[in-house]
Each structure stands twice: as C-alpha cells, then as structure tokens.
Design a protein with these regions (language model features):
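N-terminal catalytic cores of secreted or lumenal carbohydrate-active enzymes
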Residues: 1-20, 24, 32, 39-47, ...
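Noncatalytic carbohydrate-binding groove/subsite architecture in carbohydrate-active enzymes
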Residues: 9, 38-182
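Loop/turn elements at helix/coil->beta-strand transitions in domains of secreted/extracellular proteins
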Residues: 15-21, 64-68, 112-115, 144-148, ...
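Conserved, mostly hydrophobic/aromatic
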Residues: 22, 117, 186, 232, ...
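Conserved beta-strand positions
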Residues: 24-27, 71, 119, 151, ...
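Aromatic/acidic polysaccharide-binding cleft in carbohydrate-active enzymes
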Residues: 148-239, 246-251
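Carbohydrate-binding surface patches
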Residues: 237, 252-296
Length: 299
C-alpha cells in the first residue's frame, strides 16, 4: 500500500497527472486468468481484497490523499451476484463489500472507498435473453445495497458467436452495432455510469478500435480505423461527464405505448441524456436490416 501511495503521489508531483481513482485488483475472481504469463489477473479472495483496501485507505488518509479506492474489477457479472466457476470466497461481491452483515469484508464505511462496484461485461453478452436478464439482476442487487456501477473493461470474446468471435479485425458495422447493443444494455439495464473499452490499438483481433500494420523492421507501418471506433464515439463524443440519463418511452403510430419500446434487440434501441450544460444527447441504434423512421418528441 505504501508503494501504491508513492506511485499516486509521485506521478502527480512529477507529471502533473492526478489519479482520481485507483483499483488495486484486476479480475481477482477470474480463475482462467491466473495461469501463465500472458494475462493480468490478480487472484484474491474477498477477505484479501477487503484487507488490502482498508490498509490502502488508512495510508491515503494518513497522507491526506483524496484518491478514491475502487472495488472490484470483477471478470464476470455473475461473480458480483453469486458464485461462478469459483467458490464463495470470490463470489457474492456486492453483498460481501457493501452489506453491513458481512463483517469481515464490509467496506461501506471505509474512508476513500465510494459505494461503487466495477465489473467487466465479458461472457454475459449471449444469448440476447441473457444480455438483458443478467443486467436486470445486477441492477436489482446494486440497488438493494445502494451501490453504483461502472463497466470498466470489455471486448469481443469467443462466446460472441453472432459476429464470429474475437479473431479477425473487423472494420465493418457488424461489430460496431454488436458492441453498441452491449453498451446500451449495460447503461439502460445495469445502470452503468461509466463504460470502458479494453483496447485502443491492436492487431488482427476484434479488441482494437484501430488496426496497426507494422513493417517487418518494427520502425514504421500504417493504421486503419474501424466502424467500432465511430460507434463508441456516438456515446463518448456527445455524452459528457456529469450527464444524467433520461427515461425513454416509445409509442406506435396510433399513439399507444410500446412496453420496453426503447430496446428492440433486433431493431431500434434508444437512450437519452442531459449534459451538465443543459444540452441533450440521444443515441439511436438500428440493428434491423432496413431503414427505420421515427420522431423525437418532448426533448
């Protein structure tokens, strides 16, 4: 914890970059992430996470640092709600960290620790019924303990069979729309107040927004953007920090309310926001194979 505090203070002093947030663990519940040198998981039980966070909190308080300490960068939403491919010591994370009855792991009254959970959207994106249901369950558990949520990492994985899995860079709208649908569900159903993509630049895989083509000497090359990058920009360019999401209701041509009409997983999906400066942003996704017409009212 002294090392982390030294890093946060040192970077701000040397480079003028202030860390508003830091998370000391990445995917502590990801059993697949702990073997070999190619992944970056940091295996830990809930008790180990809680002990480390409390020690880090004490160090920050002693140094009068206001950097916020985040938990828990879960590899899978299911580990936040219950156990998934690991035991109870790494599961039920929302309850473990933010229910006062969890005396060994409760962090709700720990200085510099916001009532906020971080999780990764991997592996719960298919089938479409699971995409929605899992995020509704997550939101229900978060609301029960008055906890906020950030989606802090995801990309295309092998289970995303609708677009051929993760292999092979895709510059087309196919992957762009697929990811936009995930963003929509994470924000609208899970209530994510922040959303991050895994990687900016990569090779022949669907994890990069930009594809790099490096020359053999590794000294030069070229880059190519993707529609995915621009799809993400439809959110990040227009929805600014401090924005508030607005409810969206959909009506048919006769004026009848369409239940759940803001989310047609194979058609139109709509979310709306008001920025801190009073401006509005509306993000519309058309997953259908044909053009759609609509009218925006009361905005």
């Amino acid at each position: 914890v002294r090392f982390l505090a030294d890093v946060v203070e040192g970077v701000e002093k040397h480079d003028g970059i202030k860390f508003n947030y830091i998370c000391p663990f990445n995917e502590p519940d990801g059993h697949w992430n702990w073997v070999g040198p190619k992944q970056e998981g940091s295996p830990a039980t809930n008790r180990e996470v809680a002990r480390t966070v409390r020690l880090l909190s004490r160090e920050f308080v002693n140094r009068k640092m206001d950097t916020q300490i985040m938990v828990n960068e879960s590899s899978d939403y299911r580990c936040m709600l219950r156990t998934h491919q690991t035991d109870w010591q790494r599961g039920y994370q929302i309850q473990a960290f933010f229910c006062p009855d969890s005396v060994d792991t409760y962090l709700g009254d720990t200085p510099n620790v916001p009532r906020l959970m971080l999780g990764h959207s991997y592996w719960t994106t298919t089938p479409l019924s699971e995409l929605r249901a899992m995020r509704c369950q997550l939101r229900e558990a978060l609301d029960k303990y008055n906890v906020g949520f950030w989606q802090s990492e995801t990309c295309i994985m092998g289970n995303d069979e609708e677009i051929g899995g993760g292999h092979g860079f895709d510059r087309t709208m196919k992957t762009a729309l697929y990811v936009a649908r995930i963003i929509h569900h994470d924000i609208v159903y899970a209530g994510a107040k922040s959303w991050q993509w895994w990687r900016a630049i990569g090779g022949d895989y669907k994890d990069g927004l930009i594809r790099e083509y490096t020359n053999d000497d590794l000294k030069d090359g070229r880059v190519e953007d993707s529609k995915l990058m621009w799809a993400l920009g439809n959110y990040s360019r227009f929805i600014r920090p401090g924005a508030v999401r607005l409810s969206v209701s959909a009506f048919d041509q006769a004026g009848n309310l369409i239940p759940g009409g803001d989310t047609d997983q194979k058609g139109l999906m709509c979310s709306a926001y008001q920025n801190a400066d009073g401006s509005y942003a509306v993000v519309l996704i058309n997953y259908a194979q044909e053009d759609k017409e609509l009218s925006l009212i009361h905005i």
